[in-house]
Amino acid sequence: MKRIPPSFRWTVLLALAAIACPCARAQKHNVIIFVADGLRRGSVNATDTPALYMVRKTGVDFDNSHAVYPTLTTANASAIATGHGLGDTGDYANTLYPGVWLSKPDILAPAGTIAPFLENDEILADLNSAFNGNYLGERPLLSVAREQGFNVAAIGKLGPTAIQQMDAVSWNDLGNITSSGAIIVDDSTGQSVGIRLPQEMTDAMVKADLPLDAPSRTNGFGDTSQWNNGFHGDAQTPGTLDANRVQEQWFADVTTKVVLPKFAAESKPFVLLFWSRDPDGTQHNQGDSLQNLEPGINGDTSKRGLQNADHCLKQLLDWLDAHPAVKANTDVLITSDHGFATISRREIAGDGTQSTEVSAALDYAPAGTDKPEPKGTLPQGFLAIDLGVRGHMRVFDPTVRATAGSSAYQEVQIGGELSHYPGNETIAALLGDTVKKVDGSDAQLILEGNGGSDLLYVPSKNPELVRKTVALLTQLDYIGGIFVDDAYCPAATDCPGALPLSAIGLVGKSQLPRPAIVVTFRNFKMTPGDLQSAKQISDSHLQEGQGNHGALARDQTFNNMAAMGPDFKAGFVDDAPMGNIDIAPTIAHILGIEMPSVGTLKGRVLTEALAGGALLKPDAEKTMVSAPFKDGIRTVLEYQELDGVRYYDRACLLTKATATHCP
């Protein structure tokens, strides 16, 4: 018998091993996640956003997508980062109550806050210091990928970008914010308050002739110029007329001239997230529609924001086109953190009906650089004012320390010739007889304002106070839905007029204090069924006619999502419910990464959108209705469910006994 050479036997064995384990020969793919902050699905078209439109048409079009609620940036950033719902991550809103006087380690109390705005690197580092080095409690996908040998980077808008590698962010002994070698580039890069970049990144930026300091949003103009994208105007002065051009271009250049070339040269698989501030920032601040509902966020300035985000995506896609070997191995996933609506500060319905609450009837002394607003305007902090009046509670401003008296915070004057309102650009309030403790824990209610929704905390955990507050909320004409902590209302019928927080995924394993009550404000459409025409009551310093989000309304839960690349189907429309919570599980599946978990509020792998994946049959849309309060007032929640994951469409407060669905 002819003897088989040993070298040939080894060749056969290696071939058989490769067949038995395809993973041994498969090259790991790359993933680019592009987040267009505040992009509405209906804003994407071939003319204004050709790059976004191309991905939708050539790859997978997710036409039943969802943001998590509240529809806010850092909340959805936490879901995108971890694949967990907010009940697990604790990032309930952009502004929340941390339960402690939050300050930089070893800094005296006056430097802290109990109303932190999370789009801030220092605040995020403070939260990590207060909550075991990672306030999210869940591991971000990018951090896990980096540990497993992937190159990773997060680039873009301040706040949500750092959240993508949150467990790497901390204060060092010198009082600087470090990232343990992680690449995080945002608005604060290069500043003393920013996250330090690895030395190799700064060297590469110098070599690429790029500034080491991130540009501001001014576009090179003065603080009050309408060409400054950060200028929001006031009640009598229109806001910006331009997109965030200069800063966004710098982010795109850092990505395509430094980060992607670095990754390509190192020949390692990578995960890159780019978070475009536009169109969000431009829609917020646009000056096209001062004190008018039309054109609102559908005007020319908002369109410039759309075009700016699309320009950034095109620059990334052009780089891939110029590097075909990388492109062939790279998936691109597009999302937005939430939708958007035009702010209404007076009208509560499409027929022009205005709010009749006390807060809208008072005259106010403008704060800071504000100017007097039109009669009948709901001021910022209107919910705190109305609860204070109806509940016979004093209102205190947690952003201003008292200079006299026994209270730790300045009281907000309500009534008299001119009233005041709480907060400035950060809207928060403490309600009660007095508040002597700096952490606010002796207040009856703590309110954190977040645009289309507000969070209410009850430090005493008094169930009678919670029920009393729910009763007050049901009587306010601008309320669009009420949700109460399961500790007080575990079932849909336990708190008349309200549903439990677990119904919207806000009860989980979070380390942070959970709100006792979450309210969403009224939302209406000027054209029935047209999400682009949506108007939103908003607890905000911004004006009627500008833009905001945060509510549980379909114009804000319906974000924009699409994907293309070797792991995704081509030319496929996915009508199954899905959303931001599914991004991390899907990418982890594609890359072969095992994600650790603490909580169980997890998204699903989007198998139906992957190459070779079977189609899924979605369940019928579902409705949950609370027990009625007096006059039949009840909260209605409309949602979808698939593979045990809930996707929230809208909520409303119904008063007609015959109505069963939100208008």
Regions found by a protein language model. Give the residues of each.
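Acidic, Ser/Thr-rich low-complexity intrinsically disordered segments
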Residues: 612-663
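His/Asp/Glu-rich, glycine-adjacent segments
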Residues: 85, 91-289, 447-459, 465, ...
